[in-house]
């Protein structure tokens, strides 16, 4: 996910700066990502079946616990889908995507008023998170509200749950790694509802403000950084 966003930002910024159309960016991005996916599949053609069999084995051996974990994640997805905040932030972020798709331009119109911008708002030009959503809307023909309210929130929940599971498999290195990791995910999902006390907590972004990039930064990405730090510490420990 991180690599995907970095590649997209490098690809999108020149199009935004030169005031090219969303359609042009969509064509270039679709071609680029198609090539990347094909190359990745070819290079990992032996590992993909092995990983698939490994996941299938875990689901079969721990059917009940995996079922409970999946249900817990789906409940959070359902909650996040139905409880998105309605405020000026949601108006702006979803409005940017809608304006981009409707006008076939990028950051050339004010998302609040629809008035043409005399120049680029430099702070926003460097943030391509919403432009990526607009590209997805254009590729699949889906309305921006569906992408921003449903898809983005559910993707964040799933990525966060998977990252927490990764942390569990790294910390709990024993015979019951899978069981402990699954329990960690379930407990973490429950704690989000307890921690949702203010609109500025990572739980608030996770459950209610899922349309913002900060929802990913404060959850899936920060947990992934924790996972990398744990891996680094374990590597350093083994080297001494």
Where are these regions (language model features)?
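Membrane-embedded, hydrophobic transmembrane alpha-helices
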Residues: 1-58
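Alpha-helical transmembrane segments
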Residues: 1-9, 65-75, 185-189
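Hydrophobic/aromatic residues in alpha-helical transmembrane segments
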Residues: 10, 163-164, 225
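Membrane-interface alpha helices of multi-pass inner-membrane proteins
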Residues: 16, 239-240
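Membrane-interface helix-boundary motifs at transmembrane edges
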Residues: 48-60, 169-180, 234-239
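Active-site lumenal/periplasmic loops and adjacent helix-entry segments of GT-C-fold
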Residues: 72-195, 199-211, 216-220
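Membrane-interface transmembrane helices that cradle and orient dolichyl/undecaprenyl
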Residues: 222-239
